[in-house]
């Protein structure tokens, strides 16, 4: 895991006030991250936790963990959670295994969404956004942990390979800063 850390930045938790949620707030966060990445091309990975609220029913948390482990799990065991979240892989996702393409992901996601509807919750937006930011294989879920210092929520630790960010998103969030920094540097 150390070789990854040498070329990584950690993305900590973000909180957006409810009155600003849904109004491009996550988009603005991505622009900020992209500006930093533009200035630091030596960074190759984003690493950080994504939390599941403790207000969620535990069975829904287990389905989320199963889905993201089945389709996006890193099977090299780069990390060992201190307090592992206990869950089993569920059969609904078994046919999909590692995501091979967008269509495969869409089919699996439709199943996940239906299961979440049964629990009365929605798939957390950051889980969806990180996965959809990258080409298949570019976002890896390294493990699920219970975080006692954060209300015992369930955290997924993710590893994003920056070189797999989809072209449109790379242009929007990272390359869009080229003119800003060129103007600043020439002033």
Per-region residue spans from a language model:
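Non-catalytic substrate-recognition and accessory regions of acyl/acetyltransferase enzymes
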Residues: 1-9, 154-187
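Metal-dependent phosphoester-hydrolase catalytic domains
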Residues: 137-143, 157
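Acyl-donor binding region in acyl/amide transferases
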Residues: 1-138
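Short proline/glycine-enriched turn/loop segments at secondary-structure junctions
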Residues: 143-150
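Active-site proximal loops enriched in glycine and acidic residues that flank catalytic Cys/His/Asp
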Residues: 50, 145, 160-162
